[in-house]
Amino acid sequence: MDSIDYYNRYAVPYYEETVDASMEEVMKPFVELLSEESENAEVLDLGCGSGRDTLLLEEYGFYGTPMDGSEEMCKLAEVNTDKEVLQMTYDEMEFDDVFDGIWACASLIHLTEDEMRKVMKKLVQALKENGVLYFSVHRGDRDGIYHGRYFHDYNRRELQRLMEE
């Protein structure tokens, strides 16, 4: 089962587990950087899951664009946010200078290292000049299927190399 299949199958329990998690402290530095660049920033919530972070972005005065690859998560996020959610995979993304910011909280953890390189190029392409990108990954050396989903962890050196490319 690939990660999208996993989230389609377990959308409701995953939603219930994550929808009320507070992300304010994690999001604060991103919000501060984004506020310096644009008052009404448009932010892509990449791998939006429940839509929780889209709602928080909008509380900060930004325009959140939720996106997820899982059809079932998109349905739940649409109900939660009362917004249309873009259902597409990273491969399907084709944005040019559209977003002031991209928020990818724990959504890139299911990509192989090669996929991550390709996605990073697409994310840079999607950002406007001086755009702000936030992404989080797991630190470690795990690479493979765990609990029904693929995970690739990173160490500092791997992340630096990825960012230099």
Language-model features: locations:
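Class I (Rossmann-like) S-adenosyl-L-methionine-dependent methyltransferase catalytic domain
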Residues: M1-D97, L111-K118, K122, V132-E165
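Hydrophobic adenine-recognition pocket in adenosine-nucleotide-binding enzymes
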Residues: S107
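Conserved acidic residues
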Residues: D100
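A conserved beta-strand element that flanks and buttresses the S-adenosyl-L-methionine
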Residues: W103-A104
